[in-house]
Amino acid sequence: MAILAGKKVIAVGDRDGVPGPAIAECAKSAGAEVVFATTECFVUTAAGTMDLQNQARIKELAEELGGENIVVLLGAAEPDTASLAAETVTLGDPTFAGPLAGVSLGLKVYHILEPEIKAEIDPAVYEEQAAMMEMVLDVDALAAEVSKMRKEGSKY
C-alpha cells in the first residue's frame, strides 16, 4: 500500500540536510499533495526544538485536514534532530516550548531518505533532489530514529 499517493504532505526540511522544497518535489512525484513545506535550521533554534510557528501550522493542518490524511516528511541531517522532530509531530513537543507541548497528533512521519519512501518517488526526481544527501548523511541511523518514533507515537 502506498504511503504517499493521495496523502497531504507536510515537508519539514533541514538547512543542513534535505531542504523543504526538495522534499516537496519528491512527494509530488509520488502522487502526494504538499500542503506545507519549510526548511528549518535545527541548530539555530533554541533548545533544538522545532520552530514554534511551524508547530502551530502543523497543528492547524492536522485539525483542518484530519491526521489520518497527513504524512510528515523530514529532511533532518542528524538522527537526534530527526527523532526530536518525529516526536514533536507524534507524541508532542518534548521541550514543552511550543503549541504542540502536551499535544499528541499521532501523525505518520518518515524521513525522506527512508527506503520505503524512496521507493515511491520518481527515480529521476529523487536523484535530482535528495540522492546527494544519501552519500553524506547516516541514512540507517536517521531511519532507525524516525521509525522508532513512528512505531511509538503514530496513530495512523
Curated annotation (Swiss-Prot):
Catalytic residues of the enzyme: U44
Keywords: Oxidoreductase, Selenocysteine
Domain of life of the native organism: Bacteria
EC number, UniProt record: 1.21.4.2, 1.21.4.3, 1.21.4.4
NCBIfam families: reduct_selen_A (NF040748)
Function recorded in the entry: In the first step of glycine, betaine and sarcosine reductases, the substrate is bound to component PB via a Schiff base intermediate. Then the PB-activated substrate is nucleophilically attacked by the selenol anion of component PA to transform it to a carboxymethylated selenoether and the respective amine. By action of component PC, acetyl phosphate is formed, leaving component PA in its oxidized state. Finally component PA becomes reduced by the thioredoxin system to start a new catalytic cycle of reductive deamination.
Subunit structure: Monomer. Component of the glycine, sarcosine and betaine reductase complexes, together with components B and C.
Protein name: Glycine/sarcosine/betaine reductase complex component A
Species in which this protein is naturally found: Carboxydothermus hydrogenoformans (strain ATCC BAA-161 / DSM 6008 / Z-2901)
